[in-house]
Amino acid sequence: MNMKKFFAILLICAMVLSLAACGTQNSSADSTGQTLAATRTVTDRAGREVEIPIEVNTIVCLGSGAPRIAAYLQVVDKMIGAEDCDTGDVTVLRDYSWVYHDELKDLPSCGKGGGSGQNNAYPEQIIQLQPDVILAGFSAESADELQLQTGIPVVSVYYSSINFVDESFYEATRIFAEVVGAEERCEELLNFIDECKAELDERTADYAEGDKPTCYTGAVTFSGRHGFCGTYANFGPLMAVRARNVADEIKDVNYFETDFEQVLVWDPDIIFLDPGNMNLVSEEYVSNPEYFHSLRAVQEGRVYTMPSFNNASTNITYCLMNGYWAGMVLYPDAFGDMTMEDVADKVLSFMLGKNYYEDMVAGGLYYGTIDIGG
């Protein structure tokens, strides 16, 4: 350990001990003999039992997904610090950050931010802020580390990006709501998501497997940006509408890099691509235009956008919207009464209180066709 890091840890420990000592002195000086504030225990997503105050009025939200849940639960007003990724320049790639930027941009910095699940918080600043609770999209080890660094309860609300709004998000949101007293809004939110999922399922339930077009989603974003061969098996928005995703034949995986020859063997009826990564696909096209023109979906003009919904964990809003979009493309008869403008208004207005679909389109998150090489 270098000396700079050693002295930084000493400083943090000294601050924590100083605050604890002040609390002890104040308690001892209390002639009425009143006990310290009552607490309660919550079990977080990592299975840790965390003792927190009965009433939680101020919070800091860190890491993968935690600030987003605060926005969905409409408790951003309890946040007294924000991460660097939400206070600087923001884009529509992160739903909550775009909507709540005015509220977050002037809050004190309390961490770097991002979706790593690791502890990249700024403990000294958090100690100065003294929130009642820290809610973090951290692993158990990272949550323990930050709690030791600050002396403040850390509740893990990490959720995964696998499949289509899976149970981990429900659990994380309910734990978050329990901490901040937002149980009513929480159940409204989760019921809304359930209704969307049920609608997608019901509209596609009567299609025989052989009557469905095959499809492939490429140029996806996972651990960075990828070109045409970056894909997903068990891709949430496609699963939600019972799609025939050709990549699903690769078992027990989620995102992976296939190869050009395999996609040609699959030769899907419909191709979805992330518009945010089309510069990579365009470079591949320039290198081998004949390959792309040999694909039936390209020949027939059946290549569509599928905007990325992962940025510092999953944008649940965009994930739901992508499910509706997949349904519209794959089953036009079943979704002919819908437009993406209507879907965006429904999802964004309920979950974030603002329909900013025009901003999404302007920022590159649009729903439509793609002309590869055009």
Located regions from the model:
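Bacterial signal peptide processing site
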Residues: 23-25
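A short, structured surface patch at a secondary-structure boundary
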Residues: 67-125, 133, 246
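Structural recognition of the beta-strand scaffold that forms the well-ordered cores
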Residues: 58-63, 78-83, 133-137, 154-158, ...
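Sec-dependent signal peptide recognition
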Residues: 4-12
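Proline-aspartate-enriched helix->loop->beta-strand connector
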Residues: 115-118, 122-136, 260-276
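Alpha-helical, coiled-coil/dimerization segments enriched in small aliphatic residues
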Residues: 227-254
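C-terminal motif of bacterial Sec signal peptides marking the signal peptidase cleavage site
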Residues: 18-21
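Extracytoplasmic substrate-binding proteins
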Residues: 49, 143-223, 247-248, 305-372
